[in-house]
Amino acid sequence: MRSHYNTDLGISHVGQSVKLCGWVNSYRDHGGVIFIDLRDRSGIIQLVCDPNDSKEAHEIASNARNEFVLIAEGTIRPRGEGLVNPKLKTGEIEVVVSKLTIENESAVPPFAIADESVNEELRLKYRFLDLRNPKLYENFALRSKACIAARNSLANMGFLEVETPILTKATPEGARDYLVPSRVHQGEFYALPQSPQLFKQLLMCSGFDRYFQIAKCFRDEDLRADRQPEFTQIDVEMSFCEQKDVINVAETFLKDIFKACGKEIQTPFRQMQYKDAMENYGSDKPDLRFDLKFIDVIDIFAKSNNEIFANIAKDTKKNRIKAIRVPKGDTIFSKRQMQRFEEFVRKFGAQGLAFIQVKEDGLKGPLCKFFSEEDLNELSKRCELEVGDVVFFGAGAKKTVLDYMGRFRIFLANELNLIDPNALEFLWVVDFPMFEQNDDGSYSAMHHPFTMPKNIDETDLEEISSIAYDVVLNGVELGGGSIRIHKNDIQQKVFKLLNIDEEQQKEKFGFLLDALSFGAPPHGGIAIGLDRLIMLVTGANSIREVIAFPKTQRAQCLMTDAPSPASNEAMRELGIKLRENIK
């Protein structure tokens, strides 16, 4: 129907006849000559409807309004002197229209397509209009390139794309499952997969050797800016591999994805042990675009005359005292800013925020009186303090201190404008603990219970580490993976450590244990969150900007009004009866 997309055309096409299709982006009547900005998925081009060129086209144009669908035929000509629009790819040219068709009319739109101030709920209610925004289209064009690049890269490395089931069995993977009632087997339910984890392991047991899938996953969890109830991941599994092999594959396809998106990245990525990430940055996904690394000063505070700090410093296993040095911070921060810093950390469990300022005549601050001159000199040397610096201290329980100081580090970086928005800092975080303790004292798998432990015979669960790895970009976890357990006895032992008895093992994971009993190969893999990846590449503010039809923070689709009540007939067929007074 069309001869070109709008932005295929340029000054080299002057004099050429074209046929274009699209929507009215804007409409202007200048003294009898009508100018229409025609928008298609590629961008905008200006149509000129002059009655001297075509009375019929001009008359039709006079009836056009925003978001009407047009088909225009005409000739390319250069714009007049001083009329070039450098903001448009087609800003040097315009189309003199000889024939115009209104293919379809539009109701008055509830908002202007390019208006960035529109309430997000309104945008999501009319998502089909919102997606006409060229900026959003660019996000999905980039997403498509990324998917194609991932497929090509993995195929070139010998990986086979295999689809795994969407209707499957509920298995504990950390979040709540979405359940689907069975009509045929009433009273029984399928679960939508939180990931293809067990199926891809079974494919390795089947001898497929190298698998991948761009997989849809479902998790019924509370939403945040970077979470959705359904999301997409680049899922990879391989046999007869070690951690370094999986990392090499992941770096290869990530490099190819970024190249397809117009960005060059350097490999190999740097690596950091989990314990170092936590102790030095207060996060298992540290943002390395800036420094502000923690300094451990608990041994110096152990010698202080302050009873509170001295008591904290006695237990170096359970407690931490960390410092963050801000070069020239004493010359930058106002008294009000220093108060705001303390208010910030208190929101995350801090009892306060101690600090020392470096003046021309030495270290100053309420803390100084609790230290000897020798200890202050040691503190100054440890923190590499210079005149004009300020150093902040966090002290208390290990988990609390690392958390609030990690958050404070990012808060400081934003206050100081230390973060380069164009930088791409990749990092592998490796050697994760196998287990983590819950608030009730029980233990759960930090990644998942199918991860290979390094020292399974260790009696202290907190000392057992795993062959697990996360890839981080600019402080955001892109994805993670592990070498899997491929021996039945080790898998059963891990289940027992998680208080999953033999009956539960058989009920929930019997098929996996069976597969591990028939010569399962060593295997491992990784999953990269595609939505999150594209959000970072495009600079989008929310993951909703890179998903065509996303849910809200309340897990609702405002456009289709999902979820919605099922009919009484459908409920009867499924054998389901709701309790009364359910809202």
Curated annotation (Swiss-Prot):
Q: Which GO terms describe its cellular component?
A: cytoplasm
Spell out the residues of the site Important for tRNA non-discrimination: H30, G82
Q: What does the sequence similarity comment in the record state about its family?
A: Belongs to the class-II aminoacyl-tRNA synthetase family. Type 1 subfamily.
Q: Which domain of life is it from?
A: Bacteria
Its EC number is 6.1.1.23
Cellular localization per UniProt: Cytoplasm
GO molecular function, one example?
A: nucleic acid binding
Q: What class of enzyme is it?
A: ligase
One biological-process term from Gene Ontology?
Answer: aspartyl-tRNA aminoacylation
Q: Where is this region: Aspartate?
A: 197-200
Q: Which Gene3D superfamilies would you find in this protein's record?
A: Bira Bifunctional Protein, Domain 2, GAD-like domain, Nucleic acid-binding proteins
Assembly and oligomerization: Homodimer.
Q: Which InterPro entries match?
A: Aa-tRNA-synt_II, aa-tRNA-synth_II, aa-tRNA-synth_II/BPL/LPL, Asp-tRNA-ligase_1, Asp-tRNA-ligase_1_N, Asp/Asn-tRNA-synth_IIb, AspRS_core, GAD-like_sf
Q: What is the protein name for this chain?
A: Aspartate--tRNA(Asp/Asn) ligase
Q: Which cysteines are joined by disulfide bonds?
A: none
Chief location: cytoplasm
Q: Which residues form a coiled coil?
A: none
**What function does this protein fulfil?**
Aspartyl-tRNA synthetase with relaxed tRNA specificity since it is able to aspartylate not only its cognate tRNA(Asp) but also tRNA(Asn). Reaction proceeds in two steps: L-aspartate is first activated by ATP to form Asp-AMP and then transferred to the acceptor end of tRNA(Asp/Asn).
- Catalysed reaction, written as an equation: tRNA(Asx) + L-aspartate + ATP = L-aspartyl-tRNA(Asx) + AMP + diphosphate
Residues recorded as binding L-aspartate, renumbered to this chain, are E173, R219, H447, R484
What HAMAP family does the record point to? Asp_tRNA_synth_type1
Q: Which gene encodes it?
A: aspS
